[in-house]
Amino acid sequence: MIRAYMRFPGGVSKTLTLSYDDGVEQDIRLVEILDKHGIKCTFNINGGVFAPEGTVYEQGKVHRRMTKKQCYELYAESGHEVAVHAYSHPHLECLPASMVAMEIFEDRKCLEETFGRVIRGMAYPYGTYNDTVVEVLKNSGVAYARTTVSTEKFSIPTDWLRLPATCHHNNKRLMELAEKFVGMEVSANPQMFYLWGHTYEFEANDNWNVIEEFCEYIGGKDDIWYATNIEIYDYVQAYNRLEWAADASRVHNPSAMSVWVKAGKHHSKSQIIEIKPGETAKLF
């Protein structure tokens, strides 16, 4: 029997991604931590509620949104992703479809104008949504939308518009899950660790050590691909577009990026193969 499994860039079997919401000042410290350990994050921003330029927050206020200028300076050339979080951070499931569409389009337009790129990712405000919201997203250029559901698992998503996470950073099992992920020997389907939260929570709970220890432990591993949400989404879609011969002896890559496959007639004889853009590769 022929077996073939997706592998991430370089042929690795695991990927890590983070997702943090609201565009708050504490994101600055998180970016410093992530960059130190080579970890990528998606930052979900509400384009309609940037802090006004010159804002001075009262002492003790924890949820401090950044100005548009601050957000640009932090994220624009950082290598991290910027994604939609709805224009005004509403409960989308409470709105009629027309207003949901407006919230998404206005946020996309604002962020695309600010950062000069196409914005296709999203996290649901408050983590709430319904089927109507999902249908609107399908027609609004949104590729994926993160929920607040935590599975404590590492499966690759199948429903990208109802995207769950592995866990929130306050999960008591965070380091246990990290150790399990790092120690995994993956022979079949690839694995993804997805962490989410809000950086102001680190200040509110006085627990920056949680994310510092996590990143120090899980960063810098040769067998983990550190990627943003959209990078993982795009890669999985490219893999799914591979065109296989009837007997799976050849495979054609019609996409614009290289794709890696672990393929073999038996697990013990599997090989990692890079299929370059436009290439038809012979596997056996």
PLM feature spans:
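C-terminal domain-boundary segment and adjacent tail
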Residues: 1-8, 112, 144-153, 179, ...
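Boundary/entry segment of secreted carbohydrate-active catalytic domains
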Residues: 1-26
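A short acidic, amphipathic alpha-helical/loop segment
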Residues: 5, 29-33, 132-136, 210-214
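Hydrophobic "anchor" residues on beta-strands that sit immediately upstream
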Residues: 17-18, 81, 224
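Active-site metal-binding loops of divalent metal-dependent hydrolases
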Residues: 20-23, 86, 199, 229
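A Trp-anchored, charged/polar loop motif used as the substrate-binding/catalytic surface
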Residues: 24, 168-184
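Metal-dependent polysaccharide deacetylase catalytic core of the NodB/CE4 family, i.e.
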Residues: 35-143, 150-167, 190-199
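Non-membrane alpha-helical structural segments and their capping/turn regions in soluble enzymes
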Residues: 97-102, 172-175, 205-208
